[in-house]
Every structure is written in C-alpha cells, then in structure tokens.
Regions:
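Alpha-helical membrane-protein topology signature
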Residues: 1-210
Length: 210
C-alpha cells in the first residue's frame, strides 16, 4: 500500500506535465496553487533523514516532486503564460501562508527545532495549497479532463495515506492525518463544483471540456 501511495503522490505532477505537453496550454491550472506545492516539496526535501512523517517518502521521490513542481511553475509563468487564467487566479497566497506559519509555530507536536517548525508549516500549507485551484474553478470558462484527473489523483493519494495510517495506527501522528482529512474535504468541494458544471452547463457561463 505504501508503494501505491508513493506512485499516487507522483501522479498529479505527471498529469499536469502531460496536460502542458499535449495541449500546449496551462488553462485551468492555478499557478498560485503550484507555487504553494513547490514550497511544500522544498520543505520536505530538507528532511534529509526522513525523521518527519511529513517527509517519509524516499529521497529520490522527494527530489523528483521538488523538481517537477518547479518545472510546472516555470512552464505556467514562462512558455505557457499567454494561456494562464491570470484573471481568475486571484487569491492572494499571503492570506494562506501567514496563518499556516502561525499554526506551525503554536500548534507543533512538541519539537521546536527550526526544521520541525518548517515541516509543520509545510504540512499546514499542504492543506490549503489546493484552495487557489478551487477558486480558479469557480471562475474559468472551461475545465478539461486533465484538471479533473489531477484533482482525482490528489484525492486518491490522500485516501491511500489514510488507509495506510489505519493499517499502521500505532505509528501515526496527528498532524499528517488532519492534513489528509481536511484535504479530502476540499477535494470533495472541487468534485461537487465539477459535477455542477456538468449538470447545469446550460445555466452557467462555463462548461466542462471533454
């Protein structure tokens, strides 16, 4: 199950890269969400020895996630910037980053080292990193199947994480589990939005692109 979870952790980045390559467009992708994920993966890479449950992926996977996240950000704001939904991706990341930093300082699990605070910050940030993507979904005129597949893969990863925690409950810690449950709730909101697009496309000014 752990191997499946590792593969599902990489899958969202693969899907986004496939979308960028196949469509030559970053439409429907929140650049601000990708920046937040790049911060998350950067912090997790710093956990060199894998001592944190937040950075428990194999080192090669953490490095791969870091590199692909920065590549995606570069492609969105670089070669494909003309297709970027800038007018809809308007949520200020500062409103998400500051509360996460405060939570990392005051709601950490005992360890007060700088590395522990940074990893706790990454965990809280990972909860809300999808929020700019949800905001963008509410404003764009189309949502393609790549974006839907991206959201599904993220939700599947978190579901596998929780199942793996259930199998190894004695080794679990609270923070990653809270991250997973809250993220899944956010993904449910995203799926409800996409479902509404499909069910009411004659009544709203945007559609789901097949």
């Amino acid at each position: 199950m752990a191997l499946l979870g590792d593969l599902l952790h990489v899958l969202p980045s693969v899907i986004l890269l496939a979308k960028l390559w196949r469509t030559n467009s970053c439409a429907g992708i929140s650049g601000k969400s990708q920046i937040l994920y790049a911060f998350v993966f950067s912090a997790q890479v710093l956990d060199v020895y894998g001592t944190s449950s937040l950075g428990s992926n194999p080192p090669w996977m953490r490095v791969s996630l870091l590199l692909t996240s920065y590549l995606i950000v570069f492609l969105i704001y670089g070669p494909y910037r003309k297709t970027y939904d800038r007018d809809q991706d308007v949520l200020y990341n500062e409103f998400l980053v500051l509360p996460c930093f405060l939570l990392a300082l005051f709601a950490k699990e005992g360890n007060s080292s700088p590395e522990a605070v940074l990893l706790a910050f990454a965990a809280w940030l990972e909860i809300v990193a999808i929020v700019p993507q949800l905001e963008l979904l509410c404003g764009v005129q189309s949502v393609d199947n790549y974006v839907v597949s991206y959201l599904v893969s993220l939700a599947l990863y978190r579901t596998i994480f929780i199942l793996n925690w259930a199998v190894q409950a004695s080794e679990a810690v609270a923070l990653p589990i809270i991250v997973s449950f809250v993220q899944i709730l956010l993904f449910v909101v995203a799926f409800l939005r996409v479902f509404k697009l499909k069910q009411t496309k004659e009544k709203v000014p945007y559609d789901v692109v097949e």
